[in-house]
């Protein structure tokens, strides 16, 4: 394709709000253009890359007998009300109503709709298992869209849904999808690591995320250097081994602590280590207030709280609620209280005596507080985030941290949707059973961004061969010179039969062409310049920067060999 005919609006300067390198490069290289916050148009080069990604996805889906369909983005509210998610999903769900006052959502996922499609069709165990997938735009009203395609309000996704008669069948499809996702990310050129994760608003009993390692990633991965253990930090278990500090129990004392708000400020004020301070936070669990205690250097993990209490209906109490309940602001809370409120403490709190806690009075704290004498703990548990260097639950050694971008996730949904939506089949005994489900998503547009995030240098994008928008970049330095133009035209005609060629035939300065070529990042470059009359051209590899002069008689062989050896 001739570059003069392709819409590639490269930029010299990018908006300052483009923080992620992938966002900057996708804008700068003319692959995407922002329409409004979190919404982008995919221009010709990006569209070609997306087509290459989706081709790989389709191949791997078909390999495991997943069948493609296409569902509407617009979903009626009644389906979401059946599952209970219409009220539970929150403000991220884009809601609208038609001229008749009927409520709809622009789908972020399609569990409800796909369940409604199959519930009256998959009637017998003989029709199972069945896996359906689609590639489609999704919508989520992000509070703060950022990082370009990594967190947008409209995005392209491959979502698949499987239906089963028993757990063994679900396990097999889950494993098939897990392996298919691993192959997909390897093929598109992403270093992605599967990690144990939380299922969030989608629900389900078991899930893995596929995380593309990147410094810009918004998720923290906990992993082992000695085993294949990897988990999202929200799910990483903290191993508790008792380490009691045997100090003499001291009398309870109330002290004034003016202008002290945080655990670190309190530790500094008292001249004590922050891990001897105990923080108290108040949550509402299904409408009931509880206190949760952790040591001063630890942070409460609300995902673990949801898992522990078996409900998503958990939220941090507001400042007004806290003041009304205990008469003090959040920085002064403590478990020594004359109100009926259940107290839960992280396992590591029980290692301490003579605790320092809030006095439930602004500007005051209690020291030498002891469990059993001054207050009681209803239950201990793992309620906090793991720290780097702590022991991992698989016994392999210390926890290490890395940042990652979630590019895919697989879920075992069980009967969460089929039960609420009455999707049943007859088993081999003729009894009605709820369909057992799995769901599996890949962020296609996010994968595009993750590829760029992991495959670039200071000059621009470096496309992996499998997804590159074109294989070769043919550049005529000066098309006004007959020998250069004629040779470039001839090479374009020859190589276009075997490769996808982008032919830069523009009337631009050489520097502009080379800068654009580096930005766009095609794997191989053929430059027709001042030695065209001798039949000599330059061949350059984008990844290594290696270049050599080649006679046109040898050019096809050289290019074919180099291309075959590309990754």
UniProtKB/Swiss-Prot annotation:
GO MF terms held by the record: aminoacyl-tRNA deacylase activity; ATP binding; catalytic activity, acting on a protein; proline-tRNA ligase activity; transferase activity
A GO term from the CC aspect: cytosol
GO biological process, alphabetically ordered: prolyl-tRNA aminoacylation
Pfam family, one: tRNA_edit
Catalytic activity from the UniProt record: tRNA(Pro) + L-proline + ATP = L-prolyl-tRNA(Pro) + AMP + diphosphate
EC primary class: ligase
Protein role: Catalyzes the attachment of proline to tRNA(Pro) in a two-step reaction: proline is first activated by ATP to form Pro-AMP and then transferred to the acceptor end of tRNA(Pro). As ProRS can inadvertently accommodate and process non-cognate amino acids such as alanine and cysteine, to avoid such errors it has two additional distinct editing activities against alanine. One activity is designated as 'pretransfer' editing and involves the tRNA(Pro)-independent hydrolysis of activated Ala-AMP.
Quaternary context: Homodimer.
Family assignment from sequence similarity: Belongs to the class-II aminoacyl-tRNA synthetase family. ProS type 1 subfamily.
Domain notes: Consists of three domains: the N-terminal catalytic domain, the editing domain and the C-terminal anticodon-binding domain.
Stored PANTHER family: MITOCHONDRIAL RIBOSOME PROTEIN L39/PROLYL-TRNA LIGASE FAMILY MEMBER (PTHR42753), PROLINE--TRNA LIGASE (PTHR42753:SF2)
Protein name: Proline--tRNA ligase
Source organism phylogeny: Bacteria, Bacillati, Bacillota, Bacilli, Bacillales
Gene that this polypeptide is encoded by: proS
